[in-house]
Every structure is written in C-alpha cells, then in structure tokens.
C-alpha cells in the first residue's frame, strides 16, 4: 500500500542522492558526473514532495540508507574514474530494475492521486537515467 511505497521510495531517494553526489566528483565520464548532478537534484525534490504528501498521515519515513546500501555508498566514495563508473552503472541499473515495479504497482493500486503523479514522474526520470547509462 501507500505506506510501504512511501518507505521504499524514501529509501531510494536517500541512496540515489548519496551515490549521485559521489558521481558528481568521482565519475570518470563527464556525462556520469552531469547525470549525478541531475539525480541528486531529482532525489532531493522527490523526497521533499514525498515528505509533504505523507506529513498529514503520520507515516514515518526512513532517514538513513539500509546497511547494504551504506556499504555501497562507502565503496563508491573510495573509487574514482572508470572503477567508479563500473560500480555506479551496476548500482543504478539494479536500482532502476528494483524500483520500476514498485512505482508501477503504486500507479495501478493507489487511490492517492498525488502519490500516483509522483510515481509517474519518477518512473519517467528513471527511464531517462536508464537511457543515459546504456
């Protein structure tokens, strides 16, 4: 339901924001650095929108990345150039593959039009990121 979606979506924003900030400075390819800037901005605005939407419903959103994601964030911070790019592409491709069905399910099942709109917008952004890393 909406609560589970909001929590997964929040986690995605936290992790995408952290990894994208590393991409801005550690990426070997300049297009990945630029993509990092875009993703960091998107994740921040998505999180702001989500926080606003769930505020009246007393839904607790995660504020930190899960342990396995924290390890990934740490590894990315330690890498530079092509090594960074390889791991970042792998992470982003996996993240998109995992999140698309979550977003699709929310779009189909939710009666909250604002959450549906947010899910649709995010889905479009993930598709755009996917094209850039192929």
Give the positions of each predicted feature.
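His/Met- and acidic-residue-enriched segments that coordinate or traffic transition-metal cofactors
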Residues: 1-134
């Amino acid at each position: 339901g909406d609560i589970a979606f909001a929590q997964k979506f929040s986690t995605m924003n936290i992790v995408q924001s952290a990894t994208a900030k590393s991409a801005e400075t550690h990426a070997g390819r300049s297009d990945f650095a630029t993509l990092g800037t875009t993703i960091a901005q998107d994740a921040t605005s998505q999180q702001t929108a989500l926080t606003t939407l769930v505020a009246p419903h007393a839904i607790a959103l995660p504020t930190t990345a899960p342990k396995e994601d924290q390890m990934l964030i740490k590894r990315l911070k330690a890498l530079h150039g092509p090594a960074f790019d390889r791991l970042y592409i792998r992470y982003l491709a996996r993240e998109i593959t995992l999140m698309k069905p979550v977003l699709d399910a929310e779009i189909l099942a939710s009666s909250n039009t604002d959450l549906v709109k947010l899910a649709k917008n995010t889905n479009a952004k993930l598709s755009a990121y996917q094209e850039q890393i192929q």
